[in-house]
């Protein structure tokens, strides 16, 4: 049986789409994950095609051992949310996935400036680990929900283990899964190592 989403979507989440949408798609992702990068334009297109029928939620699941820049990228997106609200988060989210090959701290600060936010404030937040607890909370909620790789998707609080690589199939599967709970073998994820640590503790 598929593991359900243990932490319900709430006011702390980053949400795009209407609250009364019939389908809620939750992604546990990693900004440095190759597969998440491949999924990004597909998810964007699915959201566009489904319009008001879908609500999209992004949660952090940085695989620190495999992706050394992922944690700071996640923290930078949280800092952007703190400065610019929901719009700030999604603008940074898009910048990070559009520039996966350049995620050093200097790059992160440049993206912050490009979306019109205070890069100095984000630099200070990264140095102090201000938003590390927020990222860690997402990570832990993913572990409790059976997440062991990225990207991992949940459709209406049930894990979706089908293929997301084909946009048409993914769109159809999201709607089918919402109605019938149909499942397929998992395809295309970066897997968390057995001994992978959680994101770093507070500084």
Q: Predicted segment positions?
A:
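A short beta-strand-turn-helix
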Residues: 6-23
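Structural alpha/beta surface segment adjacent to cysteine/selenocysteine redox centers
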Residues: 26, 31-113, 184-200
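Residue-level preference for short coil/turn positions at secondary-structure junctions
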Residues: 19-21, 52, 149
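Short clusters of hydrophobic/aromatic residues that line enzyme substrate/ligand-binding pockets
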Residues: 15-16, 103, 160
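Generic structural signal for beta-strand residues in well-ordered domains
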Residues: 16-18, 26, 49, 146
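N-proximal helix/coil linker or "cap" segments that precede and/or mark the start of modular domains
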Residues: 1-4
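C-terminal cap of thioredoxin/glutaredoxin-like
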Residues: 28-29, 40-45, 110-203
